[in-house]
């Protein structure tokens, strides 16, 4: 398989722009779906089926389906609403497992295989504008317990779980969709609280989403953890994570302004150790990012090695779970 196809495997794109159709034929790694893509159950199943048939390589077919305010299929539920992580957890372990099984079965019925959940941030800041009830709790042990139930239930029922948002978004006071939040806590404090749930699942979890956060314990400069070699190396070397490190959405302002061009930002992510990238669109400029990096990687040994390494991880997970 050529280098360009391996690079395409590192990207999960959305439907906006329709560039995904050609990208699938070039080896695109996966697709992500939002509420705007989902109108009826029949229509959505047909969309997913069409994408599968067009793909050169089996794709990750993904969604953010946490429950509560992050629920993409609510328009086709016939009035049913899943509870957010906080309220589901408060109803007890049996309820949490049952709801997770319902979500897994629903996602499978549409042909999906990857859910960007659970959210294992420890919600220590009550004024956090982006996490809140998406977190199981503000208690570390509760978050660890919730993660284990949800991830295991997804895994046992054919859905790949992805924990988020490393190294922990719970103390943030800003929304990374709009800006780059800063968490100014020493590493030992981060380890006791926000990093602890990631440490607890690191050796078992298939995928970790890395946040667009500036954590001063990793980088003094204004660099998000998603582009921080120190942060991603810590995840692997200190916590023992051997799976896929994936970015949060790369069009979020917390990361998008980190380079002169979008391809430069993405290249920084590859060099930092990210294995996959989410772009909520497949506009021509997003496809251009892949093409630009592919061209550069042919003459850049480090970039090429990182792409090869990522491809091995992606292939391994696909072979075992898809």
Regions found by a protein language model. Give the residues of each.
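Divalent metal-dependent hydrolysis catalytic cores, especially in the metallo-beta-lactamase
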Residues: 28-35, 113-119, 273-277
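Short, acidic/polar
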Residues: 14-26, 95-106, 190-198, 258-268
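Second-shell residues forming the walls of enzyme active-site clefts
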Residues: 36-52, 59, 69-71, 145-155, ...
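Glycine-rich, aromatic-flanked loop segments that form ligand/cofactor-binding clefts
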Residues: 54-80, 96-123, 143-167
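Glycine-rich anion/phosphate-binding loops
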Residues: 39-46, 88-105, 138-145, 188-192
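A charged helix-plus-loop insertion that forms the helical arch/lid used to bind
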Residues: 77-92, 135-137
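N-terminal hydrophobic targeting/anchoring segments and the immediately downstream early-domain regions
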Residues: 1-77
């Amino acid at each position: 398989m050529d280098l360009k196809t391996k690079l395409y495997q590192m990207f999960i794109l959305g439907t906006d722009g329709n560039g995904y159709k050609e990208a699938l034929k070039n080896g695109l790694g996966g697709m992500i779906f939002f509420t705007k893509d989902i109108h009826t159950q029949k229509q959505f199943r047909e969309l997913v089926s069409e994408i599968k048939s067009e793909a050169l390589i089996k794709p990750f077919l993904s969604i953010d389906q946490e429950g509560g305010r992050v629920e993409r299929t609510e328009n086709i539920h016939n009035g049913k609403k899943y509870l957010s992580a906080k309220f589901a957890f408060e109803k007890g372990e049996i309820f949490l497992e049952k709801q997770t099984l319902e979500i897994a079965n629903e996602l499978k019925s549409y042909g999906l295989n990857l859910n960007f959940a659970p959210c294992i941030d420890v919600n220590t800041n009550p004024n956090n504008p982006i996490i809140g009830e998406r977190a199981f709790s503000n208690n570390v042990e509760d978050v660890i317990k919730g993660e284990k139930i949800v991830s295991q239930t997804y895994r046992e029922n054919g859905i790949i779980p992805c924990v988020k948002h490393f190294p922990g978004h719970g103390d943030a006071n800003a929304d990374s969709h709009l800006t780059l939040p800063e968490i100014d806590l020493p590493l030992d404090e981060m380890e006791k609280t926000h990093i602890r749930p990631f440490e607890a699942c690191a050796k078992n979890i298939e995928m970790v989403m890395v946040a667009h956060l500036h954590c001063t314990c990793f980088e003094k400069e204004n660099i998000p953890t998603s582009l921080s070699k120190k942060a991603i190396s810590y995840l692997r070397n200190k916590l023992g994570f051997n799976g896929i490190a994936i970015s949060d959405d790369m069009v979020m302002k917390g990361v998008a302004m980190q380079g002169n061009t979008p391809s430069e930002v993405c290249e920084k992510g590859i060099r930092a150790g990210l294995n996959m990238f989410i772009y909520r669109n497949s506009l021509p400029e997003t496809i251009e990012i892949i093409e630009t990096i592919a061209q550069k990687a042919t003459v850049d040994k480090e970039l090429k090695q990182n792409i090869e390494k990522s491809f091995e991880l992606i292939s391994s997970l696909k072979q075992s779970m898809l």
